[in-house]
Amino acid sequence: MITVGIDHGTSGIKVCIKNNDKTITTYFKMSRTELKNKSFLGELNKYENLRDIDLIAMGYSMGDGINEILPIEKVENRGVINIEGVGEKVGGGTKMYDEIKNSNIPTVVIPGLHKNIECIDARFRALYSHMASPEKISIAYCAYKTYGFNNFILSDISSNTVSLLIKDKKLFGGFDACIGAPGLLHGAIDLEMIRDIDSNKITANEAFSTAGVIKVVIDKYKGVENTKEEILKNYKTDEKCKLAIDTLILSVAMEINSLMFLNPDKNIVLAGSIATTKEYNLVDKLKEYIKGNIYILEGESGALGGALIAEDILNGKKDILGIPVNI
């Protein structure tokens, strides 16, 4: 059995190819710019014969146009209501999606976490129209399969920060990138930004795209693909870079703690490029603020989670953390 998981994130895509027959797992990445200028399937074919792939699992953008995991041929409008208000758009992900859809490779599309997902607690559905994009579902599934917890908080800390609560093996609720803790790039819109939006200095989407802790050190902004490396490069020598990361850690702790009273087993799983950057020492710093059991997912957990979802669907699983599978 060969399955492929695709994590379509802010800075590009990460791909996991899981070959159960040979017990081999292969990863590769493509930047958003690369994706726009190259054939995704041409790149995938370098690692695995396309005819041998049993199932691809992927998400697209916010995933708010579908409520269950569906075959790609049954998905309308790429599974989104529209693509406005979702951060900077390059076009590579759209090109990849259409290339896969036209290929006849068996593929399922994973929804995002939004108000029409029925396993979510009614109070979260009343509060928020959207809680997570599809790759966060894949990361949560990777955490579930890796650690086997029935109850846990997943906090994915990268260009944005999204924290999800899983209770009794089902998604219960969470905080999207534009609601709670900021990420490196994206974050909640505050008073100053509301004024800038109302005075037509910036759009709401532009505000969201730079409302993360990058606003502390905006001169280090190098676009969605290169800002992380720029911050890391200057972290030990630039006080503002250090302040940005320290601010991020504090806000993540606040977000996780706000969900802890609903998390009976006190298990927290961290993921994402900021969480796994050794220089930031995130786990030890978060332990100062959080009373719980903190674990970390190394590597490309979104891509691996997608491959695991595809594998379990082929093995007959009817739901993924409470989200129905309809194939």
Swiss-Prot record:
Coiled coil: none
Ranges annotated as spanning the membrane: none
Protein family membership: Belongs to the UPF0285 family.
Alphabetical list of HAMAP family matching this protein: UPF0285
Protein name in UniProt: UPF0285 protein Maeo_0978
Natural source organism: Methanococcus aeolicus (strain ATCC BAA-1280 / DSM 17508 / OCM 812 / Nankai-3)
